[in-house]
From Swiss-Prot:
A cellular component annotation (GO) from this entry: exocytic vesicle
Interaction with TGFA: annotated span: 300-385
Full protein name: Protein naked cuticle homolog 2
Compositionally biased residues, Low complexity: 332-351
Region (Interaction with DVL1, DVL2 and DVL3): 113-178
Residues annotated as binding Ca(2+): 132, 134, 138, 143
Organism whose genome encodes this protein: Homo sapiens (Human)
Domains as described in the record: The N-terminal domain comprising the first 217 amino acid residues is mostly unstructured.
General function of this protein: Cell autonomous antagonist of the canonical Wnt signaling pathway. May activate a second Wnt signaling pathway that controls planar cell polarity. Required for processing of TGFA and for targeting of TGFA to the basolateral membrane of polarized epithelial cells.
Region (Disordered): 1-108, 162-237, 256-408
Length: 451
């Protein structure tokens, strides 16, 4: 998980495999150890003087800690201006100071080892990146344990392979809003961590700021501020779900979340107002002053005014007039209690409507003049109104006998098709309605024509 890359300014890079298998560790101790050994060898060469043992005479009194002043040009780019030089710089400064000593002063190797601290010029840069492969937006305990194990191995290798045995390391870990963090080396032992800030970002644009003795690390980690992290995860899921539902709705595909989501009304509440709105619309259209072709007009209304399932039908129910008299019971009968909730309309329900629509309103069938072979005679209208007055209450007998069996047939044969596929229903209904309408028309025409 944690991918580690490290750079070294003064030493060559050496590959080292960690348990993660994909980490690089620089050999930070190579140049320091080589410089120290070379400085010791040159110091021994300088101690070989022709006048004998270097530990007699003025050299015993002149043993003192050798302090090397830091030149101005060497202090550039250093983090601490008062720090001591590395082994090579200390050797060059000692060579400059050596001849100035009283009576040809020689260097002591003990003073060089003890009083002049040989520091490595280990410019190290470590970058730890925690990837989010599953796009969950959260860092698990296993991810953090793997990352900290990798960091521990890298820091342990850097400390144990150093030339100085008493070298300690202070780790300062900060996760800043920018995708870059800093690790500093300092005196106290152990790990001193500042409070980290959580930054859950999708992109990882790494711009580590490189400095001397500073390890740059980028770790995505929730520790002290988990609230933005916990809010980020569900927000991503909701956003993706909304986008998916939006495109599915545009394509006309029925999906589970759009039908039963928190923002959608129940299916039964949507479909029952749909049927009632279409019937009420047919009722209002049939009450227009032009009383011809009521059956044909009703079938056209059922075709043209199909209310979509996603649109609430409350406005249609409020604006349409309430049905009165015998047709009120008829209009309520198609959506009877036998219909299962959530089952959308289909072609079988359209057939059921077409079967007993003409049976309920037989006197209105002769009003359609579009399919007559010849126009009806004038007395036909008077008998039509008398027949309508006589048979005004008779159609109620047929719906009481028929709707029970018809609705059971609808419940039994109704396939569970989505509401989006039910737009072919009114076409079949219109065709069969015309068929039965013509049958009734011819029957009534031959019945009334001799008179």
């Amino acid at each position: 998980m944690g991918k580690l890359q490290s750079k070294h300014a003064a030493a060559a890079r050496k590959r080292r495999e960690s348990p993660e298998g994909d980490s690089f560790v620089a050999s930070a101790y190579a140049s320091g150890r080589k410089g120290a050994e070379e400085a010791e060898r040159r110091a021994r060469d300088k101690q070989e003087l022709p006048n004998g043992d270097p530990k007699e005479g003025p050299f015993r009194e002149d043993q003192c800690p050798l302090q090397v002043a830091l030149p101005a040009e060497k202090a550039e780019g250093r983090e601490h201006p008062g720090q001591l030089l590395s082994a090579d710089d200390g050797e060059r400064a000692a060579n400059r100071e050596g001849p100035r000593g009283p009576g040809g002063q020689r260097l002591n190797i003990d003073a060089l080892q003890c009083d002049v601290s040989v520091e490595e010029d280990d410019r190290q840069e470590w970058t730890f990146t925690l990837y989010d492969f599953d796009n969950c937006g959260k860092v698990t305990r296993e991810d953090m344990s793997s990352l900290m194990h990798t960091i521990y191995e890298v820091v342990d290798a850097s400390v144990n392979h150093s030339s100085g045995s008493s070298k300690t390391l202070r780790v300062k870990l900060t996760v800043s809003p920018e995708p870059s963090s800093k690790r500093k080396e300092g005196p106290p032992a152990g790990q001193d961590r500042e409070p980290t800030r959580c930054r859950m970002e999708g992109e990882l644009a790494e711009e580590p700021r490189v400095a001397d003795r500073r390890l740059s690390a980028h770790v995505r980690r929730p520790s002290t501020d988990p609230q933005p992290c916990s809010e980020r995860g569900p927000y991503c899921v909701d956003e993706n779900t909304e986008r998916r539902n939006h495109y599915l709705d545009l394509a006309g595909i029925e999906n589970y979340t759009s039908r039963f989501g928190p923002g959608s009304p129940p299916v039964q509440a949507k479909q029952e107002p749909q049927g009632r709105a279409s019937h009420l619309q047919a009722r209002s259209r049939s009450q227009e002053p032009d009383t011809h072709a009521v059956h044909h007009r009703r079938s056209q209304v059922l075709v043209e005014h199909v209310v979509p399932a996603s649109e609430p039908a409350a406005r249609a129910l409020d604006t349409q007039p309430r049905p009165k008299g015998p047709e009120k019971q008829f209009l309520k009968s198609p959506k009877g209690s036998g219909k299962p909730p959530g089952v959308p309309a289909s072609s079988k329900s359209g057939k059921a409507f077409s079967y007993y629509l003409p049976a309920v309103l037989p006197p209105q069938a002769p009003q359609d003049g579009h399919h007559l072979p010849q126009p009806p005679p004038p007395p036909y209208g008077h008998k039509r109104y008398r027949q309508k007055g006589r048979e005004g209450h008779s159609p109620l007998k047929a719906p009481h006998a028929q709707p029970a069996t018809v609705e059971h047939e609808v419940v039994r044969d109704l396939p569970p098709t989505p509401a989006g596929e039910g737009y072919a229903v009114p076409v079949i209904q219109r065709h069969e309605h015309h068929h039965h309408h013509e049958h009734h028309h011819h029957h009534h025409h031959h019945h009334f024509h001799p008179s």
